[in-house]
Amino acid sequence: MNPFMNEDFFLCGETAEKLYHGVAERLPIVDYHNHLSAKEIFENKQPKNIAQLWLGADHYKWRLMRANGVPERMITGDAPEDQKFFAYAETLPYAIGNPLYHWSHLELQRYFSIDTPLCGDTAAEVWQRANERIAQGGFSPRELLLRVGVVARCTT
């Protein structure tokens, strides 16, 4: 059995692994549906921390936090950014089976080299490690789009 969230996560079998790693992994991405802000891409600002990157405008994460009873102040309100991130970390274990659970962990692995499952107990460590990586640069909207090979995108 493969470990959880390895490079072949969601690839069920040898054929899937060959097709993905041999062909699809290196293809350019034409993204027909996303919720990226055209204004943020134009401004191309470097985020200061993972809360700005992840929680600044992600209505999927906001909805998950609301469903978990997180006060609005900790979602879109005036709470400190680290506290918003910690609230998301506390929420995430309740999302097993929701794509956000997998997406969040895939992003931690691919962009931050963090394999630690995100939860309340690990939030401070993940916050620190992710922010150290963000401080090195390369996380502005355009830099991220180029890094993953997006050649065209359409946004809502």
Question: Model-found features: residue ranges?
Answer:
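Metal-cofactor-binding active-site regions of metalloenzymes
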Residues: 1-156
